[in-house]
Design a protein with these regions (language model features):
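Ser/Thr-rich low-complexity repeats and stalk/linker segments
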Residues: 1-214
Length: 214
């Protein structure tokens, strides 16, 4: 079996969230981490939220009542080792709005999403639509051009087009009017069109926008 030295190896992996549910007024996040790992969410001006995964690595995190838009940094602690996730968990309007994981250069993971279009990400040069599927490849059309969506694991797909700006995105026959990037500097959450837009800075001097349709 593994020795103590093996268990203290650097392969402590960040938590992977795979869903959110509402239990009364409380948001409950579900996911996986290492067996018996301590999963922690840290946020500015908010007490850290923590739980311990079970022997299979599954965990449920119950968030306290939140107000406004809250950004959490997920991490895992195993013994003396900690792994901070490259993703930021964003809870919009205290959970009344979307719950999503954002990361520079990556398609946004919508924890509260359904089948269809979950998110549209842009860095000003390209536009990336993504969502989840029940197994069949979705039909995706951007500005009249049929796309070939790519499976990216965890039951999700993405389609990338080499241009940015407002667009009409149609997924399985349902159309969405993507409003384009936000102009804001810093971290901004705003209601735009029939959805929410998050704009945040990415290194070294760029920014990324994700739009989360209703």
């Amino acid at each position: 079996g593994p020795t103590g030295a093996d268990e203290a190896s650097p392969w402590v992996r960040p938590p992977q969230f795979d869903g959110v549910m509402r239990d009364g007024g409380v948001l409950v996040l579900r996911g996986g981490a290492g067996p018996n790992a301590r999963v922690v969410l840290r946020a500015p001006d908010t007490a850290a939220v923590a739980t311990t995964a079970d022997g299979a690595g599954r965990f449920e995190l119950r968030l306290p009542p939140l107000s406004g838009d809250v950004r959490f940094t997920p991490e895992v602690q195993v013994g003396e080792d900690a792994a901070v996730s490259p993703e930021t968990l964003v809870v919009i309007q205290g959970g009344a709005g979307p719950v999503a994981l954002i990361a520079a250069g990556q398609p946004t993971v919508r924890l509260d999403g359904a089948e269809g279009l979950d998110a549209v990400d842009s860095d000003g040069a390209t536009l990336m639509a993504s969502g989840r599927t029940n197994g069949a490849a979705p039909s995706v059309n951007i500005n009249g051009a049929d796309m070939a969506p790519m499976a990216i694991g965890r039951g999700r797909w993405r389609a990338v087009i080499g241009r940015a700006g407002p667009a009409t995105i149609t997924v399985n026959g349902k159309s969405f009017d993507y409003p384009g990037m936000g102009a804001a500097g810093g971290f901004v959450v705003e209601r735009v069109g029939a959805g929410w837009r998050i704009t945040w800075p990415v290194e070294p001097s760029g920014r990324q926008t994700t739009w989360l349709p209703d």
